[in-house]
Amino acid sequence: MGVAKFKGRSGAPRRMDMFDSIRTRETRENAIDLVNAVLGICLALAPWALGFTGEVAATWNALIVGAAIALVALGALFAFREWEEWVNLALGVWAIFAPWLIGFATVAGATYAHLIIGLIVGVLAALDLWIVHNRPVSTT
């Protein structure tokens, strides 16, 4: 697998830097990943913000899943790969069902945080996948 090279202003080839990925993706796709990164951080901080740190399973799930969502979304900003959106879709679905699967559905703050953030992350990841698969083919 070779390194992508582009011609710089002088006409000489230059190596692709990590920000070329951000510049070449659509603004709305970058916005989706940025929103998902912020939502992941919000989920990771939710136990302290919403006061459910006493519920160990909910706290650890929010921290791990939130951090994973944020890291995957930030990774997609710098080097987009389709699998990153599939991972965030799966993490969003997991966050939706985690309160019942892990057993903290009776903790209102934890349940609502997981449901709302999981739903938004899942929908945005699915939207990003839809955009990738329905992008018009360039003829230029």
Which ranges hold each PLM region?
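Structural signature of hydrophobic alpha-helical transmembrane segments
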Residues: 54-67, 112-117
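Juxtamembrane loop-transmembrane helix junctions in multi-pass integral membrane proteins
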Residues: 10, 17-30, 53-56, 76-82, ...
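A short alpha-helix capping/helix-coil boundary motif
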Residues: 12, 18-19, 63-64, 70-71
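Intrinsic N-terminal pre-sequences and regulatory tails
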Residues: 1-34, 131-140
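Extracellular/lumenal glycan-associated surfaces
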Residues: 28, 32-53, 66-76, 88-105, ...
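Tandem-repeat/low-complexity and Cys-motif detector
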Residues: 32-34, 60, 86, 112
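Cytoplasmic membrane-interface segments at the C-terminal ends of transmembrane helices
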Residues: 77-85, 129-140
